[in-house]
Amino acid sequence: MLKYEYILVRYGEMTTKGKNRSKFVSTLKDNVKFKLKKFPNIKIDATHDRMYIQLNGEDHEAVSERLKDVFGIHKFNLAMKVPSELEDIKEGALAAFLQVKGDVKTFKITVHRSYKHFPMRTMELLPEIGGHILENTEDITVDVHNPDVNVRVEIRSGYSYIMCDERMGAGGLPVGVGGKVMVLLSGGIDSPVAAYLTMKRGVSVEAVHFHSPPFTSERAKQKVIDLAQELTKYCKRVTLHLVPFTEVQKTINKEIPSSYSMTVMRRMMMRITERIAEERNALAITTGESLGQVASQTLDSMHTINEVTNYPVIRPLITMDKLEIIKIAEEIGTYDISIRPYEDCCTVFTPASPATKPKREKANRFEAKYDFTPLIDEAVANKETMVLQTVEVVAEEEKFEELF
């Protein structure tokens, strides 16, 4: 029986781009090549409106599993390539149909004749191909409105593609076309989702995590490393900056009125993150804030916190409720890591009654009583930076190194 030899990738949103589309296509091709590193026989051809992945014997299911997490891919189809002869097309359509998994009762045929000199018209091809499937299967009927399977035939000069297994991609834009941002990665449910949604818009991310030993444990730190590792499924790598925050928090607890300690803490985080962003050539800061979720996420709080940075602050979750955020976290694989019961620095010295409508004037007045600059400098200087990659890529590189 014929087997799938190709995967045809459709771009989706990238097709709206104009003169710079080639940059988007090139970046997507590079990201796909990186994602499929463990499949040495694969060949990739990226055209202006579609990508063709030639499997050359590689497992199409394993390849498909990795493709679904690549941003910039709208949909993709497993495909067979056959000569553009009627009998070959009929046999290819039947073979593709028989390989569809699940409870299939109905189908339809869709034909696109890119090669206009093919001797049969579309309306002549439909009954020929559909009839061949009906003759060689049982308990199957045609449903042109809501079929279980759509057998798609693309006829070209010399060869045709047969497709019926259509799968959804991650959508969005290829990571890397939209610059870089710094993501505040707390270890909770929200911030990894914010990182994911930022990457979906084609933006590379680096993560900043604030930890406060001995008030926060090594297990809490490892949780954040694991979250960053999980996010590498959707990009080439995630650079994680672990910032020691103990002295800053102790000083805030001592010098700032408790009602404003949360606000000032967030302002210090923004200042430190901006410094790291300048070092790393990032263009914005992303947070996992959702409007009204906690005291530090009211409009008044965000207005006061934003004052200390000139960088754009991206808040992808701003209008989502918690259940919507949890749903995405479960889908992308970060939820089970986020709910591990380890504390983070935001729970250290939590005030009993934080201000929900903090004023910039008050925050500035409280901060002016103590020079936080040396503490900020120290936190930036003592940060620990690590680069995380997909586990499989790391394993392949280690395997390569062992040869020498």
Swiss-Prot record:
A Pfam family this chain is assigned to: ThiI_fer
Top EC category: transferase
UniProt xrefs under Gene3D superfamilies: 3.30.2130.30, HUPs
GO cellular component, one term: cytosol
Domain THUMP: 61-166
Annotated CDD domains: PPase_ThiI, THUMP_ThiI
Keyword Plastid included in the entry's annotation: no
EC number: 2.8.1.4
InterPro entries: Rossmann-like_a/b/a_fold (IPR014729), ThiI_AANH (IPR020536), ThiI_fer (IPR054173), ThiI_N (IPR049961), THUMP_dom (IPR004114), THUMP_ThiI (IPR049962), tRNA_STrfase (IPR003720), tRNA_sulfurtransferase_ThiI (IPR050102)
Amino-acid biosynthesis keyword on record: no
Annotated GO biological process: thiamine biosynthetic process; thiamine diphosphate biosynthetic process; thiazole biosynthetic process; tRNA 4-thiouridine biosynthesis
Binding site for ATP: L184, L185, H209, F210, R266, G288, Q297
Main location, first listed in the record: cytoplasm
Keywords: ATP-binding, Cytoplasm, Nucleotide-binding, RNA-binding, Thiamine biosynthesis, Transferase, tRNA-binding
Subcellular location: Cytoplasm
Pathway where it operates: Cofactor biosynthesis; thiamine diphosphate biosynthesis
SUPFAM superfamilies linked: Adenine nucleotide alpha hydrolases-like (SSF52402), THUMP domain-like (SSF143437)
Record PROSITE patterns: THUMP (PS51165)
Catalytically driven reaction(s): [ThiI sulfur-carrier protein]-S-sulfanyl-L-cysteine + a uridine in tRNA + 2 reduced [2Fe-2S]-[ferredoxin] + ATP + H(+) = [ThiI sulfur-carrier protein]-L-cysteine + a 4-thiouridine in tRNA + 2 oxidized [2Fe-2S]-[ferredoxin] + AMP + diphosphate; [ThiS sulfur-carrier protein]-C-terminal Gly-Gly-AMP + S-sulfanyl-L-cysteinyl-[cysteine desulfurase] + AH2 = [ThiS sulfur-carrier protein]-C-terminal-Gly-aminoethanethioate + L-cysteinyl-[cysteine desulfurase] + A + AMP + 2 H(+)
GO MF term (any one): ATP binding
Family: Belongs to the ThiI family.
Its biological purpose: Catalyzes the ATP-dependent transfer of a sulfur to tRNA to produce 4-thiouridine in position 8 of tRNAs, which functions as a near-UV photosensor. Also catalyzes the transfer of sulfur to the sulfur carrier protein ThiS, forming ThiS-thiocarboxylate. This is a step in the synthesis of thiazole, in the thiamine biosynthesis pathway. The sulfur is donated as persulfide by IscS.
Protein name: Probable tRNA sulfurtransferase
Species per Swiss-Prot/TrEMBL record: Bacillus cereus (strain B4264)
Gene: thiI
